[in-house]
């Protein structure tokens, strides 16, 4: 009656996936060993920064019989902080080659080398009396974070069934925030943030990597990688059987076969070809604006220098570390709240609300810092502003851009888009980490005016350019951007192929 008359088999109905133990444990193993690393190393040098600076000064004195001057210490500490995102930039450029040659799971396993080696080096840096080991290790840890920032979402997204991808996708950001929070806890002076405990504090970053090395090999590789990249349907079928807990997987396998055919016809887009395609111009510009806005709006300035900000806002130095822990609780709660609301309120509403809160908090914080000496009571308002900023960033600018990034690109261009996204993320992260101390020293409270302006400009771009993607298929989103890019979307194109000019030649697969 239906498809039989046309000589084609009836469509295979898809079966809703459930959160099976294998999928749950694979997600936890991958996220703890990768996303946790990013969050932990992002925050671990914040609270005990005076302890690290003291070690730098003592080591320098033993070598040169004199202490560092203020400018040299500022430069060295800025390097310690900013080497992490610089390594992340390098890692983001390597990930495209690794995920295709070694697989998604294989990339995560290899990446643990870049966590275990620096953990050992930082653990012995005090005994070796070499602060250079800390600076070098921060670069290597950045490479680790840069690779996992792209490889982990790719792995989890390809493990999960369609109806669970949103939930599984939020696990990455949740573990990043948990890593930040535990680093804040362990960094307390009463625990490890002291002259005796800081080598252990830094070396702990190797523990999640070691646990992932011991557990992740027992879980399957991405079935999409096995079938589409390697052409191994038997391995993909076996992986799906373990991940789904049933043998009714023909619909999902057929979807992968269609994607494999589309990729053979279209090929992977390289980064250079992605940048040249008119049909992807607004999508590319949108992820650049979203990722640059995420970092340049000041979130890592707050993470890196939270204690200094609290002290400037009137909190006693002895108590600022506990206020930082409180901000970590706010971060976790609001990130989980965002995961709950993103499918109810939509992406645009959370982004606009988040940037609105962040920009307003920066403006009020500027006023507080300027006048708190005259009105001491304003110091409490300063703490509220910092907490409000963290809440605003956690509800939108921090967790939502990775969701939008996945939705506005289709399969053939997604890998190249992830590389661009990662490069922008880490480059802007590096800029803030390196320049913020000098900017704060030069213009003081007015530095937060810059962040408020960036929040405003990013919000305007989102309001004018980025459509609401909630509840829309990839094809529907692609059609919206096709109109914006002023290109025609051929109706016969598969969902897995990006819109482009009909005369465009297939792009050859390259890593960059």
Swiss-Prot record:
NCBIfam families: SP. It is a multi-pass membrane protein. Belongs to the major facilitator superfamily. Sugar transporter (TC 2.A.1.1) family. Glucose transporter subfamily. The gene is Slc2a7. It holds the Pfam family Sugar_tr. Keywords: Cell membrane, Glycoprotein, Membrane, Sugar transport, Transmembrane, Transmembrane helix, Transport. It catalyses: D-glucose(out) = D-glucose(in); D-fructose(out) = D-fructose(in). Residues 43-78, 129-138, 194-198, 303-321, 372-379, 437-445 are extracellular. Disulfide bonds: none annotated. Probable sugar transporter. Even if its physiological substrate is subject to discussion, it is able to transport glucose and fructose. Does not transport galactose, 2-deoxy-d-glucose and xylose. GO terms for molecular function: D-glucose transmembrane transporter activity; fructose transmembrane transporter activity. Its main location: membrane. Glycans are attached at residue 57. The chain crosses the membrane at residues 22-42, 79-99, 108-128, 139-159, 173-193, 199-219, 282-302, 322-342, 351-371, 380-400, 416-436, 446-466. GO terms for cellular component: apical plasma membrane; plasma membrane. Residues 1-21, 100-107, 160-172, 220-281, 343-350, 401-415, 467-512 are cytoplasmic. One of its GO terms (biological process) is D-glucose import. This is Solute carrier family 2, facilitated glucose transporter member 7. PROSITE patterns: MFS, SUGAR_TRANSPORT_1, SUGAR_TRANSPORT_2. SUPFAM superfamilies: MFS general substrate transporter (SSF103473). Residues 491-512 are annotated as: Disordered. D-glucose binds at residues 294-295, 300, 331. It is found in: Cell membrane; Apical cell membrane. InterPro entries: GLUT, MFS_dom, MFS_sugar_transport-like, MFS_trans_sf, Sugar/inositol_transpt, Sugar_transporter_CS.
């Amino acid at each position: 009656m239906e498809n039989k008359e046309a000589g084609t088999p009836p469509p295979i109905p898809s079966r809703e996936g459930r959160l099976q133990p294998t999928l749950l444990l694979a997600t936890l193993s991958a996220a703890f060993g990768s996303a946790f690393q990013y969050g932990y190393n992002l925050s671990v040098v914040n609270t005990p920064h005076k302890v690290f600076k003291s070690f730098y000064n003592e080591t320098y004195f033993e070598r040169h019989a004199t202490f560092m001057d203020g400018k040299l210490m500022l430069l060295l500490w800025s390097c310690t902080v900013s080497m992490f995102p610089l390594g992340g930039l390098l890692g983001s450029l390597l990930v495209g080659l690794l995920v295709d040659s070694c697989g998604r799971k294989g990339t995560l396993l290899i990446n643990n080398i870049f966590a275990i080696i620096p953990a050992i080096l930082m653990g012995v840096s005090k005994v070796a009396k070499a602060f250079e080991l800390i600076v070098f290790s921060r670069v290597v840890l950045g490479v680790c974070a840069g690779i996992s920032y792209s490889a982990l979402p790719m792995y989890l997204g390809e493990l999960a069934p369609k109806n669970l991808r949103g939930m599984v996708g939020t696990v990455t950001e949740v573990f990043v925030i948990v890593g930040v929070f535990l680093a804040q806890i362990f960094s307390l002076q009463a625990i490890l943030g002291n002259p005796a405990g800081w080598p252990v504090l830094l070396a702990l970053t190797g523990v999640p990597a070691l646990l992932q090395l011991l557990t992740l090999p027992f879980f399957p590789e991405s079935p999409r990688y096995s079938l589409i990249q390697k052409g191994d349907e038997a391995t993909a079928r076996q992986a799906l059987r373990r991940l789904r807990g049933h043998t009714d997987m023909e619909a999902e396998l057929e979807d992968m076969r269609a994607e494999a055919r589309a990729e053979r016809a279209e090929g992977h887009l390289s980064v250079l070809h992605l940048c040249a395609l008119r049909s992807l111009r607004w999508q590319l510009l949108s992820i650049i604006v979203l990722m640059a806005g995420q970092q340049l709006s000041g979130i890592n300035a707050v993470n890196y220098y939270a204690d200094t900000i609290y002290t400037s806002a009137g909190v006693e130095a002895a108590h600022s570390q506990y206020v930082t822990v409180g901000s970590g609780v706010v971060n976790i709660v609001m990130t989980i709240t965002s995961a709950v609301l993103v499918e109810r309120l939509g992406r645009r509403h959370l982004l606009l609300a988040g940037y609105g809160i962040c920009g307003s908090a920066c403006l009020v914080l500027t006023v507080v810092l300027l006048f708190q000496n005259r009105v001491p009571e304003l110091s409490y308002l300063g703490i509220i502003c910092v907490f409000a900023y963290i809440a605003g960033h956690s509800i939108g600018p921090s967790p939502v851009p990775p969701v939008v990034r996945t939705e506005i690109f289709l399969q053939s261009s997604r890998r190249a888009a992830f590389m661009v996204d990662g490069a922008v993320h880490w480059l802007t992260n590096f800029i803030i980490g390196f320049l913020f101390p000098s900017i704060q020293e030069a213009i003081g409270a007015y530095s937060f005016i810059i962040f408020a302006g960036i929040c405003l400009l990013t919000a305007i771009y989102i309001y004018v350019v980025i459509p609401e993607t909630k509840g829309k298929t990839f094809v529907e989103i692609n059609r919206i951007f096709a109109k914006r890019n002023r290109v025609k979307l051929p109706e016969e194109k598969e969902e897995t192929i990006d819109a482009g000019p009909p005369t465009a030649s297939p792009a050859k697969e390259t890593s960059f």
